[in-house]
């Protein structure tokens, strides 16, 4: 097999660039409302952080559209705290995206924290008990008023999207694949879109 055949396949049979597109044209896709760009703030880990962000944005007359929040996991918040967090978002027209569970360092095994091999093993869920607890926290967040989730596991994304299509999960719930899942090409983006991702943060 000649590499030239691979190149020709990508050029002629796919919509993917062969190399990096330094001449990238403007996208024809837009956010709701027609904007080509929006402001997303990350690192908001508590209700007090969110309140201060809202105050600062108001003071500077800046519209913040989306907030990447509680990356440490919503399991760290009790129900009252989670509902208050969601209410701040609703009152200020903010799209909140949360991580429903704590990181792999909190799971039932030590692999993730046991050196280089564990670190590169990824942030995916391990075992069906973890998947079960993950889904329970998704439900808890939805009940609290959260409508956006950071996803680090493609299998969980597939299941969640199937549930959204069936109407079990509200259709207005959004799934954004985190950079922690390790995707960084247009091919990855298409894969994640096919699995149900509404957006993703590349490496």
Regions found by a protein language model. Name each.
Residues 7-21, 41-54, 68-162, 174-180:
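Active-site beta->alpha loop and helix N-cap motifs at the rims of alpha/beta catalytic domains
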Residues 63-65, 147, 198:
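Short acidic/polar active-site loop segments enriched in Thr and Asp
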Residues 166-203:
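Catalytic alpha/beta core domains of metabolic enzymes, predominantly
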Residues 32-34:
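Secondary-structure boundary/capping micro-motif
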Residues 57, 164-167:
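Active-site catalytic pocket residues across diverse enzymes, especially alpha/beta-hydrolases
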Residues 58-60, 142, 193-194:
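Non-catalytic positions within long, well-ordered alpha-helices that form the structural scaffold/packing
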Residues 52-64:
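A short, Lys/Arg-enriched amphipathic alpha-helix followed by its capping loop at the start of a domain
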């Amino acid at each position: 097999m000649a590499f030239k055949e691979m190149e020709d396949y990508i050029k002629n049979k796919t919509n993917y660039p062969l190399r990096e597109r330094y001449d990238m044209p403007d996208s024809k896709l837009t956010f709701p409302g027609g904007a080509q760009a929006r402001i997303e703030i990350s690192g908001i880990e508590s209700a007090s952080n969110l309140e201060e962000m809202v105050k600062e944005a108001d003071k500077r007359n800046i519209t913040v559209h989306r907030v990447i929040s509680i990356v440490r996991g919503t399991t760290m918040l009790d129900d009252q705290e989670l509902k208050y967090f969601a209410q701040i978002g609703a009152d200020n027209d903010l799209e909140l995206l949360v991580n429903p569970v704590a990181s792999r360092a909190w799971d039932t095994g030590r692999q993730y924290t046991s050196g280089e091999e564990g670190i590169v093993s990824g942030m995916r869920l391990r075992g069906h008990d973890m998947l079960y607890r993950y889904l329970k926290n998704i439900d808890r967040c939805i009940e609290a008023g959260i409508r956006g989730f950071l996803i680090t596991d493609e299998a969980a994304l597939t299941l969640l999207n199937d549930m959204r299509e069936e109407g079990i999960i509200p259709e207005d719930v959004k799934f954004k694949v985190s950079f922690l899942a390790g995707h960084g090409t247009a091919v990855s983006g298409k894969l994640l879109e096919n699995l149900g991702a509404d957006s993703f943060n590349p490496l």
